Amino acid sequence: MKKFELPCTPAQWLEAVMNAIFFLCGILAVGCVAVITIYMFLSGLPAIGKIGPLKFLFGTEWASTASEPKYGILPFVLSSIYGTLGASLIGVPVGLLTAVFLSKAAAPGVRNVVVTAVELLSGIPSVVFGLLGMQVLVPAVAKVFGKASGACLLSAIVVLSIMILPSIVSVSVTALNAVPPEYEQGSLALGATDTETWFKISIPAARSGIAAGIVLGIGRAIGEAMAVMMVAGNSPNMPDSLFRSVTFLTTAIAKEMSYASGLQKQALFSIALVLFVFIMVINVLLNAVLKGGNKDEK
């Protein structure tokens, strides 16, 4: 057994103190996650028990302030899923192609301009995205498609697809820049074109980092509230059309929490628990993708 010895020099004391600080920071991070998890389950489970898991998760009607309240969150769940998937279908290809352009093809001057624009985009507050969407996008959707109102699922998808771009682009560029140049040089030496090399060599080699950026973008989309609340219409409808006014999980909480009480407030905590579980699942999938990518690379 290794004998314990007290630090005897200033450098050793400093090392011991820093190790203790690092350890405490790690414990603090884990503790915060544990406290949040416990609180969410303790706050969210009671209402699910009172309402009934099936009625709560698969009920199609939400009327929390009616004389006979109904607490079905299926419209919220589906709206969040459809909105996130729709934003991903737009944002992921655009973000990935932008990252390839910045990493492999852009001239230095152009790269600096685009990178600066992406960084500025990442710093814009959610409420600004929502305001622009409400003033520009919503009227445009109503006019182009001949609808009475443009506040709908489609508007939310477009806004979210723009909001997730910085996460996808930034992380993907970093991953692509980390690909060893020997991989691309070997491909070019064998007669492959630049485009073939980027899509068949560079992107597969950087897949774990790109996947991380995509999952971060998805997490941003599913957790967004303010911008979505300003453009989606906020009606608890089933999302059976892109032009339907809908409510997401996040906006349901933000819209009613200020005046909720009793079972209604407990139900909102249950919605937060469902959202929390979604985020946890996304993080688990991210770790699985990263571990799988690392094993393949080894």
What are the functions of these language-model segments?
Residues 171-172, 194-230:
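Transmembrane alpha-helices
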Residues 228-276:
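Interhelical loop and adjacent transmembrane-helix boundary motif
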Residues 15, 94, 107-112, 180-181, ...:
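Amphipathic cytosolic juxtamembrane alpha-helices at the membrane-cytosol interface
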Residues 173-177, 181, 188, 255-298:
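C-terminal transmembrane helix and the adjacent membrane-cytosol boundary/short C-terminal tail
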Residues 119-164:
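Generic hydrophobic transmembrane alpha-helix motif, especially the helices
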Residues 73-101:
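Transmembrane alpha-helix signature in integral membrane proteins
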Residues 1-26, 286-298:
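Transmembrane alpha-helical segments of polytopic membrane transport and secretion proteins
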Residues 94-133, 297:
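Cytoplasmic-entry segments and transmembrane alpha-helices of multi-pass inner-membrane transporters
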